[in-house]
Structure formats: C-alpha cells, structure tokens
C-alpha cells in the first residue's frame, strides 16, 4: 500500500515537473531579443513599448549611421565617480530636490534638454527601426540615453535562468580559490559574497554596513528607475505622454496641462487591470483550448483549400494553354495551305515561262510546226498553237507573279489578348450594390431595386436583408430577415406590416464569396392596408373632356371646342366646367389607403373622398358649364358653410393647382392639421411626387399625406354614414395617375423566336 502511494506521489511530482518545464519553454519565447534571438541583456523599452538589448540597440544604431547616440540608459549609472562600487562611503544617495530648489532651477533655464545648446533650431531626430513591429520609432535627441531599462524584464529573465539551470550555482567573487557558493549579493558593491566575505567587506559601523543584501546574481541592476533627463528617481506617471517622470519633469513646460498621477496610483491601476485580465484568461482555459483546436482545424482546412485552389488555377491555365495550342495549330494550318497554293501557282507559272525558251517546250513545238509545207495541215495545227502563243506573248509583255510572296494578311494582333492575359487575376467579390432610391418604394408590398457600381466584378446572385426599426430591440446582435439567392437586380417583399419603418440592405455573391453590404435604406410602409380600385367613368364624366386609360388607372382632362362654344352662349363673366371621376370601390369599414400622382401642370384638381350618394346627387345633375352661382362642392375647403354647423361634411377634398397644394381659409375650421410642423391653413405648399389618402371609416377622418415621406399634409372630418368612395374633380386641364399596386404588376416578357421568356 505504501509503495502505491509513493508511486502516485512520484508520478504527480513528475507531472508537475513536466508542466513546469513546458510552461518555461513556452515562456522562453517572450524572453528572447528580436535582434540577437538570445535572452535579454539589459533590455531597453522603446517608445513603441517593445524591448531590445542595449548592445543590440547600439549595433542597430551604428548600422543606421548614428554615431555617438548609443549612450547608456539613465537607469544604469555611467560615471565612474558615482558607480556603487567606487562611490565614497561618505557620499549618500541624492535626495529629491525641494520645491524652492525647483523654482530656482526653472528660473535659471534648467528645463532645456541635456546636451542641447540654447537656441538650437534644428535638433537631430534619431529614428530607430523596431525589429518587433517593423516600424520606425523616434528616440529623441539623446538616443538610447533617453530610454528606460526594463528592470522587471531583467528580473524575469534572471528567475527563468535560475529555474532552468541545474547545478549552476553562483560562486563568491571575493573568496580565495576554490571559491565557496555565494549566499548573498550586494547591489551597491555589484558583487556576490559568501557569508564570511559579506561580513568581511561590510564591517560593522561603516557606511557599507548599511548596504542591503540581495539574492546572489550575476547581473546587478539599480534599485529603481532614474529620469534620463535629470538623473532623479521617477515618482509620477504622465498619462498623456505615457511616460514615467520625476519631480523636475512634472513642473516642466513639456508636461503642462497633462494628466499626471503618482506612480503608486498608476502601479495599482495597471496591476488591477493586468490581474483582472490574467484571471479572465486563466478562468477560460477551456475556451482557449477550444479556439486553439478551431485554429488548428482552420490551418488544416487552409492547407487543403490552398492545394485545391492551386489545382484549379493550374487546370484553368492548362485549359487556356490547350485553347492557345489548338488555335496555334489552326492558324499554322491555314498559313500552310495558303503557302502550298501559292507555291503551286508560282511553279506552274515557272513551267510556262520555261516553255518559252529557245528549243524547248512551246517554242520548240512552234518552230517545228513552221516547217510544215502542207497548207491545210499547217492551218489545222497552227490555229490552236497560235492561241497558246498569243497568251504566252501577252503574259510575257505583262509579266506579274501569279501569287504574292508576302504573308502580311496572316499577321496577328494580340494586343487585346495580351492585355487580358496581363490583367488576368483572381476573381474579386462584388462591390457594395447601390440602391436605386428613385425606383425603390413601399406600397402594398416593398419593391427594392439596386445596381452594381461600374467596373465591379459580376455577382451571381444577391442576398437581401431587412428588418423593422420600430420594434423593441432584442438582447444580442441585431437580427435580420434574409432573402437568399435573389436573381436579378430587384426584389419584392410581400405582406409588410402597415405603419412601420423597414431598413433594407443587399449584397452580392459570386464564386469568390460575399461582398460588402450596400448602404441601409429606410422605407415607411403605408399607415393602412392599400385599397385596390379602378376609375369608373359610367356616370358624372364627360367623354369629350375626360380621357381614361385602358387600364382605368389614369385620367386626363382635356378642355376642347365644346367648352368654348358653350361658354360663348352664356352672358356670365366667368364660366367653369367641373368633371368628376369616382373609384369603382366603396369603403364601408376599417382603414384604407391609396396614392396617386397629380400632373404639376394641372390647372385645378381636387383629390379626396365622399359619400357615394352625395357625390351622385351633387355632380350627376350638374350642368356642363356653370357659373360661380352654382357651387358643386360642399364648401368645406372654401369656407362658404356656416362654421357653427358641427355635422361632418359629406366630402373631403385636397385642392391642387399649378404644382401647389392650396389650403383654403376654411380648412382651419373643418380640417385639423396632423402636427404642429404641418402646413398652416390659408397657404400653399409644394406638390409632392405622390399624394396619399388614408381613410379611417370608424373615426370618420381622412388624412392627406406626402406618399414619399409620409409627412402629414391635412386631416379632415368626414361623414361616414354610408359607403365612401374615392373621387377626383377637374376644372380645366389636368391629369391624375393612380399608383399601381406592386402585387398586380404583370411580369414583363421578352419574345424570342416566337417563345415568351420571363425577364
């Protein structure tokens, strides 16, 4: 039983030693100088907070051409008279200056930089290339002498050396051979002692007896950091400059207005932050290990993906090479065929010319024919020969090679192809799309339209994201609703909530991945469900003056010759013609909304709603040409009715004329404005691109809105004792276009070869 416990204890001890050894090896990376790749020796803290050995820093500055700027840092005493080993016992350490001495020093000009002459206008700025961050850091005029030694890092390096060294005992430096193992060290004397030597060299009753013993070490450091400018102990920390300062630095003009705190406060704050961060890291070791596993998996995936990408690129380039090789063979074949054809023609021409030589070919045959004495036989043979001789003579007189020897027509212009091959590069993700705000709107549904910027890589499909902004925010990241793999450059979002604000964005995707999101666009949905209706011209509309479109969603008033002839027969001073068009749907409950666009060039148009029965009574029997004594309107927006009548009017119209909305004086009595920022009664406001009408049947109210921004223009009471329908009145020329519901738009088709294809 005891042997088992001993074995378990031994195993636990060995595991602990292995863990300590592993942690020490891992920590060793933090203790290596980035220049010499060895343990730090007298490390200096650069302005970029990285560390470098003092000797390495001097060497780097020497390579950069800075000579004489590699002085020792202030924390290491350099004067032989002031070094701890040679300092007189009668001399005590310098104490902090008193406030009155500080004033005298400042008045005498002590605040100038050491080593810098007064009046120097262009001091040399020393730049040091940091080997850790690969950046140039400014050391100031004093070079390395203006840097602090990292004493904490030195102590960590020393503890690390002692922990990993086995049998490396530190020997006494003052013993006679053989020296004993050192048990104490003295920072002032900069030496290690055994017990006997320490007592011998620190006799009782002398100044050296006051030296504080330390653990034995091979590298001695000063007890504290000293100001590089004033050789005083640092007592404060400048948060603005992020630098330790002494009492003299604190009152200098350089730190005027800076946030300066005592070293104790900075020490406690930084220690608390570091402890808190370290505690968090140590408490989440499982998370760290999980993330390490994820990173290792990412490394493996990167290796596999990189190899696949290499193979794909190689395959594509080989494909390009195969196409080029095939094209090369085809072009060479064409040149070869052209060359053989020309050679054949030139060879035939050479043979013809050789036959013209004396005694050979055609000439020899002709000479023999001329020897014939039989006239009929000569004529028979010479007839055909003469034709050949004539052609040969003509060819001789107009000599020209039968084929050109030049192949200029076979030259290739590969400038465009070379440019394409030079610009051949990896596919980039699409750039952020640009939302077309002129074509994007919200009506019965939300229609979103966008386009890619010029010179953007193509997108195979898009992702549309949207969410409501007027709902309480849920804890955690913002949740978006997505529409994946949208083809084309537009999207339709069905059944949006009424009276809400939606924010939408879109991004493209191709084989390279997803691109950046577009800028967010905010859309207001209508305050009520959209009412679908058409224009009804069966009554109250003059076919001579009103033209209704085939789809019954647009109407135009065109005053013509009948109006002029009718006006000429009347003796009144002013003649007006009122034409009315109603919607074919009446509202009997709930809330409804619709929108329309009024032509800005319209003379006078009234857009609104009214009781269907009252509209028929008022307008169906009205004469075509009327005088001012006959008013077809209810008078609610002209102020003609008695203001004391509390009954709601049967009509509610918004008057538009010549690109302006006319808010009559009577509007203030019968119509309530929708807000304190709304228009004032008795004025005009610009006509928006679209007008919206919202009818609340139960409340008996109708609101007129800017259908683009949904800003309220006017709110009026309305008698809703019966069916209420939309109405449009025209006086003079004008036009109205109903906004077509998005859901009823037919899909645009493109006919190709007798087949209909959806666009």
Swiss-Prot record:
General function of this protein: Microtubule-associated protein that is involved in the formation of parallel microtubule bundles linked by cross-bridges in the proximal axon. Required for the uniform orientation and maintenance of the parallel microtubule fascicles, which are important for efficient cargo delivery and trafficking in axons. Thereby also required for proper axon specification, the establishment of neuronal polarity and proper neuronal migration.
Main location: other
Mapped zinc finger ranges (RING-type): 33-59, 172-231
GO CC terms: axon cytoplasm; axon initial segment; cytoskeleton; main axon; proximal neuron projection
Region (Required for microtubule association, proximal axon localization and axon formation): 411-429
Subunit structure: Interacts with TUBB3 and TUBA4A.
Keywords carried by this UniProt record: Cell projection, Coiled coil, Cytoplasm, Cytoskeleton, Metal-binding, Phosphoprotein, Repeat, Zinc, Zinc-finger
Gene: TRIM46
Taxonomic superkingdom: Eukaryota
Protein name: Tripartite motif-containing protein 46
Biased composition (Basic and acidic residues): 630-639
Coiled coil: 322-400
InterPro entries attached to this UniProt entry: B30.2/SPRY, B30.2/SPRY_sf, ConA-like_dom_sf, COS_domain, E3_ligase_FN3/SPRY, FN3_dom, FN3_sf, Ig-like_fold
SMART domains for the chain: BBOX, RING
Domain COS: 370-427
Domain Fibronectin type-III: 429-528
Similarity field: Belongs to the TRIM/RBCC family.
Modified residues (Phosphoserine): 330, 627
Subcellular location: Cell projection, Axon; Cytoplasm, Cytoskeleton
Alphabetized PROSITE patterns for the sequence: B302_SPRY, COS, FN3, ZF_BBOX, ZF_RING_1
A Pfam family per the record: zf-B_box
Region annotation Disordered: where it falls in the sequence: 67-98, 623-643
Sample GO molecular function, one term: zinc ion binding
Gene Ontology biological process terms, A to Z: anterograde synaptic vesicle transport; axonogenesis; microtubule bundle formation; negative regulation of axon extension; neuron migration; positive regulation of anterograde dense core granule transport; protein localization to axon; regulation of protein localization
């Amino acid at each position: 039983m005891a042997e088992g416990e001993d074995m378990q204890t031994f195993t636990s001890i060995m595991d602990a030693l292995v863990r300590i050894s592993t942690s020490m090896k891992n920590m060793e990376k933090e203790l290596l100088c980035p220049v010499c790749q060895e343990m730090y020796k007298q490390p200096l803290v650069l302005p970029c907070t990285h560390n470098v050995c003092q000797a390495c820093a001097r060497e780097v500055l020497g390579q950069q051409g800075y000579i004489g700027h590699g002085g020792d840092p202030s924390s290491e005493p350099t004067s032989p008279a002031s070094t701890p080993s040679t300092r007189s016992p009668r001399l005590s350490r310098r104490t902090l200056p008193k406030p009155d001495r500080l004033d005298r020093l400042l008045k005498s000009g002590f605040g100038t930089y050491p080593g810098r002459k007064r009046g120097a206008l262009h001091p040399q700025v020393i730049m040091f290339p940091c080997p850790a961050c690969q950046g140039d850091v400014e050391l100031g005029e004093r070079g390395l002498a203006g840097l602090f030694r990292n004493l904490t890092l030195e102590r960590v390096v020393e503890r690390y050396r002692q922990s990993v060294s086995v049998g490396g005992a530190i020997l006494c430096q003052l013993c006679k051979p053989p020296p004993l193992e050192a048990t104490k060290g003295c920072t002032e004397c900069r030496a290690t002692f055994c017990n006997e030597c320490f007592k011998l060299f620190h006799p009782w009753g002398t100044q050296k007896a006051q030296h504080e013993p330390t653990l034995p070490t091979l590298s001695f450091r000063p007890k504290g950091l000293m100001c590089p400018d004033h050789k005083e102990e640092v007592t404060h920390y400048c948060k603005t400059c992020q630098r330790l300062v002494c009492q003299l630095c604190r009152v200098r003009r350089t730190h005027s207005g800076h946030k300066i705190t005592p070293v104790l406060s900075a020490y406690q704050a930084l220690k608390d932050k570091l402890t808190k961060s370290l505690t968090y890291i140590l408490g989440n070791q499982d998370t760290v290990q999980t993330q390490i596993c994820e990173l290792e998996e990412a490394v493996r995936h990167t290796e596999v993906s990189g190899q696949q990408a290499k193979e794909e690129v190689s395959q594509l380039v080989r494909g390009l090479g195969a196409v080029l090789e095939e094209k090369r063979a085809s072009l060479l074949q064409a040149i070869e065929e052209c060359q053989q054809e020309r050679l054949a023609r030139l060879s035939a021409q050479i043979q013809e010319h050789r036959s013209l030589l004396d005694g050979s070919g055609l000439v020899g045959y002709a000479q023999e024919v001329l020897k014939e004495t039989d006239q009929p036989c000569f004529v028979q043979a010479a007839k055909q020969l003469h034709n050949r001789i004539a052609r040969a003579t003509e060819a001789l007189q107009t000599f020209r090679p039968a084929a050109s020897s030049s192949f200029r027509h076979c030259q290739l212009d590969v400038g465009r192809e070379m440019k394409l091959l030079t610009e051949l590069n990896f596919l980039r993700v699409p750039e952020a799309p640009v939302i077309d705000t002129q074509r994007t709107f919200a009506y019965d549904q939300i229609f979103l339209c966008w386009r890619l910027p010029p010179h953007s890589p193509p997108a195979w499909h898009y992702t549309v994201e949207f969410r409501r902004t007027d709902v309480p925010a849920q804890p955690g990241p913002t949740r978006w609703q997505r529409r994946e793999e949208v083809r084309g450059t537009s999207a339709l979002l069905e059944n949006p909530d009424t009276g809400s604000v939606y924010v939408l964005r879109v991004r493209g995707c191709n084989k390279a991945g997803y691109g950046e999101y577009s800028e967010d666009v905010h859309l207001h949905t209508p305050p009520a469900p959209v009412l679908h209706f058409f224009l009804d011209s069966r009554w109250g509309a003059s076919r001579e003056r009103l033209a209704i479109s085939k789809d019954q969603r647009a109407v135009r008033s065109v005053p013509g010759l009948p109006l002029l002839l009718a006006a000429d027969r009347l003796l009144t001073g002013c003649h007006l013609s009122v034409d009315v068009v109603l919607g074919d749907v009446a509202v009997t409950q709930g809330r409804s909304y619709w929108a329309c666009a009024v032509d800005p060039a319209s003379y006078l148009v009234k857009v609104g709603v009214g009781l269907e029965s009252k509209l028929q009574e008022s307008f169906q029997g009205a004469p075509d040409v009327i005088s001012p004594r006959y008013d077809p309107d209810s008078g609610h927006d002209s102020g003609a009715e008695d203001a004391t009548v509390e009954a709601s009017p049967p009509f509610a119209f918004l008057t538009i004329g010549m690109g302006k909305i006319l808010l009559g004086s009577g509007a203030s009595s019968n119509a309530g404005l929708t807000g304190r920022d709304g228009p004032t009664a008795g004025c005009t406001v610009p006509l928006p691109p679209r007008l919206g009408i919202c009818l609340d049947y139960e409340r008996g109210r109708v609101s007129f809105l800017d259908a683009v921004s949904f800003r309220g223009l006017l709110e009026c009471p309305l008698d809703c004792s019966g069916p209420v329908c939309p109405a449009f009145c025209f006086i003079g020329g004008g036009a109205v276009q109903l906004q077509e519901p998005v859901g009823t738009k037919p899909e645009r088709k493109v006919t190709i070869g007798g087949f209909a294809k959806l666009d």
